[in-house]
């Protein structure tokens, strides 16, 4: 325990909170350009080929972002919108690409949870 005098000389430092998505810089989303589109394999108990893209953001950051949904139309130089949100079984992937925004098309033939995948309401 420090004395009162010690606390006056050198006050306590407040702990700084680390952000989960630093590249967004407190913005809800960021625009970026795909520099590489690839598949990666997940961590130990899981097995798949997860679709990810390396994205150069408008603020200069370069991040790896997950492409959600079945099938996508992304390639190099595609303009995408990035939101926060990590993928638990892919180390280093801390961002998601927003489907249905910019050059990214929505998921085809999606009936449920359409808003998360940028799919329009099907004609009845």
From Swiss-Prot:
One of its GO terms (cellular component) is small ribosomal subunit. The keyword RNA-binding applies. It holds the Pfam family Ribosom_S12_S23. Keywords: Methylation, Ribonucleoprotein, Ribosomal protein, RNA-binding, rRNA-binding, tRNA-binding. The modification 3-methylthioaspartic acid is found at residue 89. The keyword tRNA-binding applies. Gene3D superfamilies: Nucleic acid-binding proteins. It comes from the Bacteria. InterPro entries: NA-bd_OB-fold, Ribosomal_uS12, Ribosomal_uS12_bac. Residues 1-27 are annotated as: Disordered. GO terms for biological process: translation. Residues 17-27 have a biased composition (Polar residues). GO terms for molecular function: rRNA binding; structural constituent of ribosome; tRNA binding. Belongs to the universal ribosomal protein uS12 family. Part of the 30S ribosomal subunit. Contacts proteins S8 and S17. May interact with IF1 in the 30S initiation complex. With S4 and S5 plays an important role in translational accuracy. This is Small ribosomal subunit protein uS12.
């Amino acid at each position: 325990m420090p004395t009162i005098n010690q606390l006056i000389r050198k006050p306590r430092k407040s702990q700084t909170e680390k952000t989960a998505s630093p590249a967004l810089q407190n913005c809800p989303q960021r625009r970026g350009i795909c520099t590489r589109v690839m598949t990666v394999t997940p961590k130990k108990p899981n097995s798949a080929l997860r679709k990810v893209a390396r994205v150069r953001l408008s603020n200069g950051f370069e991040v790896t972002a997950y492409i959600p949904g079945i099938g996508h139309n992304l390639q190099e130089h595609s303009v995408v919108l990035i939101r926060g949100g990590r993928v638990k079984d892919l180390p280093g992937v801390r961002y998601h690409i927003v489907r249905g925004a910019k050059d990214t098309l929505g998921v085809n033939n999606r009936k449920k949870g359409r808003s998360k995948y940028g799919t329009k309401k099907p004609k009845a």
